[in-house]
């Protein structure tokens, strides 16, 4: 079974995280939420409290097929300030496995140089932070092992794009119906 990790930082965009997790789980992808702090309790950008499946130090990330960053502020900035998150993203990318980010979070990938020469999209206003990317403004961009999404209103597009990489056609039909 495929495995996806959705990182949660305080201030994350709730729709982007829960929508993505829901779509991937419906597609039969083993999807875990992981707090980037030592506390499983994470507060979203709109003050909704979530309990992550694990903390960063409690889970093995080495076999994840996809590492996913929801946006939201200050969540995306908190992800960007986490050296352990950035280290695993770089390793994942180097190994050719999926790194994905939506809304403001593609700035993390841009800052790591993972968008150089790739098509990418993000929430309006964050385009300058997608260093080296060809910013398209599309709902979702899939360029090699990098997936980016524009924002919360397009979370279904983002989640489906990720699921299409990992699920069979019959399962795909169930997820989108």
PLM region spans:
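Single conserved hydrophobic/aromatic residue that forms the stacking wall/gate
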Residues: 165-169, 173-177
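A conserved active-site-flanking secondary-structure segment within enzyme catalytic domains
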Residues: 115-140
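A short, Lys/Arg-enriched amphipathic alpha-helix followed by its capping loop at the start of a domain
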Residues: 20-29
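Short N-terminal binding/cap micro-motifs at the start of the first secondary-structure element
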Residues: 12-16, 41
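Conserved anion/nucleotide-ligand pocket segment
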Residues: 148-164, 168
């Amino acid at each position: 079974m495929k495995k996806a990790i959705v990182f949660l930082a305080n201030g994350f965009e709730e729709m982007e995280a829960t929508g993505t997790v829901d779509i991937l789980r419906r597609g039969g992808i083993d999807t875990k939420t992981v707090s980037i702090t030592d506390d499983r309790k994470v507060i979203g950008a709109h003050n909704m409290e979530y309990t992550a499946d694990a903390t960063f130090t409690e889970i093995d990330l080495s076999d994840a097929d996809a590492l996913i960053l929801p946006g939201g502020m200050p969540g995306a900035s908190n992800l960007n300030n986490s050296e352990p998150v950035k280290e695993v993203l770089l390793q994942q990318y180097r190994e050719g496995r999926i790194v994905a980010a939506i809304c403001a979070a593609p700035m993390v990938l841009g800052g790591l140089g993972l968008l150089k020469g790739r098509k990418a999209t993000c929430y309006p206003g964050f385009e300058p932070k997608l260093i080296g990317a060809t910013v398209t403004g599309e709902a979702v961009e899939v360029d090699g092992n990098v997936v980016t999404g524009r924002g919360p209103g397009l979370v279904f597009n983002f989640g489906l794009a990720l699921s299409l990489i990992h699920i069979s056609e019959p399962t795909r039909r169930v997820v989108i119906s």
